[in-house]
Amino acid sequence: MIKLEKDGVFLLNGETFTKEYTVSADEARKGTIAYSILTAHNTSGNDKDLKIRFDAMASHDITYVGIIQTARASGLTSFPLPYVLTNCHNSLCAVGGTINEDDHLFGLSAAKKYGGIYVPAHQSVIHSYMRETMSGCGKMILGSDSHTRYGALGTMAIGEGGPELVKQLLKKTYDIPMPEVVAINLVGTPKKGVGPHDVAIALIGAVFSSGFVKNKVLEFVGEGVKNLPIEFRNGIDVMTTETTCLSSIWVTDEKTKEYFEKHGRPEAYKELKPASVAYYDSMVTVDLSKIESMIALPFHPGNAVTVNELKADPKGVLERFGLSELFSKIDENGNIRVEQGVIAGCAGGIYDNLVAAADILRGKSIGNGEFALSAYPASQPVMTQLMKEGTASDLLGSGVTLRTAFCGPCFGAGDVPANGCLSIRHSTRNFPNREGSKPGNNQSAYVALMDARSIAATAANGGILTAATDLDIDYTEPSYVYDDSAYKSRVYYGFGKADPTVELRFGPNIADWPNMPALGDNILMKVCSYITDAVTTTDELIPSGETSSYRSNPLKLAEFALSRKDPEYVSRAKATVNEKPCDAVCNTVNELTGKKELPQIGSVIYARKPGDGSAREQAASCQRVLGGSANIALEYATKRYRSNLINWGMLPFLSETEPDFEVGDYILVLGVKDAIISKTDVFNAYIIKENGDKKPLTLTVSNMTDDERQIILDGCLINYYRS
């Protein structure tokens, strides 16, 4: 089904792969589509260390307030590139009184003041709008959402934390080394009933755990590309984020051209293909004809098995993934019963998915028992077409509830299942508690990811888990007509029309960032959390869902940091900056520093591999406003989380082995300021126990740029620009 090839390969004329060729690998690397787009946007003058300027940017209502506030504090006067502000995450305004709609009105006032594009709530999810209106072949787009991926439309898109968008707003650059490029060689044609989520889940399952494509660009090539409709490609592409890759790009063809023509932007198309000789650092071959209906079991998109494998041995498969608590979902006939289905967001709410779901459900009923199914078309143009052609009526008639464009089910702000229930979703993630359950209140729920087709098949079977490939359905050939009249009525298009006389509209929850100190000569850090999970997600570092309503108030949001993973973290971090260490610790610190006064004191968390998941900067900024000085890790799950740490003034330390300290211990890093200035990557530190005992600890950092070092010295990105 999927084959990984670690060694590099040459692609000749877009058709033949070979291990060796007469052209050097270094020269042939320039033949990839990714290389051509990256170098076209590079301002550094060399192709090793890139300084990228993007064509457009996008943020949603969890992130844009913080980004604009940071940019304001750093001297923003107008948006220098098209910047789209969508309102698709906290659209329901159900938590915190007025605070969500206050943020939306702040966003509209900012779009008017600085010249932005404002998409009101319920009009579109962020990535649907960007696909429909802003993508273009050869473009690059930066978004403050990890699923910023438009590669199937010829657009290299990257999801990053807010500070990276701030840099673009201030006419600075996105600085990265030239990434490796992995060929995703698609062959064959999907069988009937297989959808984009099936392919995506299979791909994630094959590459995630090994980090095979981590921080690399996925370039989709091969004869199988032409066999996929454009929205099928979009559905695969948006999920590449879950592989931990940096970005993605696809060859373009007549189907890509037709997409742009349908959306009234024929000029956005151009043919993209590798040069006659292109070199890829590794390759993944996906035989589309062998992909089955898939399911990603809780609690990660990489927990991939076929639906029929799970059905054949439910207890064995569930036990393999540590999910024995789901044995209760197995009925007396050995079937797995689920309580909820959801088709939503940038991955699920695509037109083709909903048409296929309607084909399966047409004339059937989902029943009047526990099982419920909700569908969220990803944009008003999609909803408009579904209504015009009668597909919406078919879904409603089967018992499906049809909702507006909203990302809520993807991050815990809508369709939270009942306690102990299993939900199957065509959405992006299924991390622990991301669906909205509160473990502190003894709540738990489970989300498994499936394609819309198998979700509809399950719904048609009364909630009994069913693979769409087991059905004999005559699927409608989707015939989408794009009608953007809703956008023309409601979207504010202000790019190039900045009006400095407009006053920003602040609600009572919108607060400025607190002051953050510059780096001291030495730092003393108290260990406030020690996490030994294989991977720590950003949802665990700062929960999503209703917590996100407080996103515009840094101090209030910080109260929720690690609340579902380590509920005592916040109180420990606060105590660290408010209380002096005991005499034994102070004496040891003074002895090691040779000074009477204590160094700068902060907190630190250790996690083996933190930062998988969301691009939300709050995963780092919440630690910082509580006094966080650093993270210590064996490795960082994503480039974007490491960047968030640096941009908020926290050192991304690495340890070669699991460190021998525990919560309550102190870490003293001597000469840290001089080490950063001198570009040293190795830091001499000490673990100090409460009784004053000490032992040495070696910490490192890797590949910090000069700008990143200066940001650390200044204390955060805001200070860096102020100075």
What are the functions of these language-model segments?
Residues M1-S723:
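Fe-S-dependent hydro-lyases/dehydratases of central metabolism
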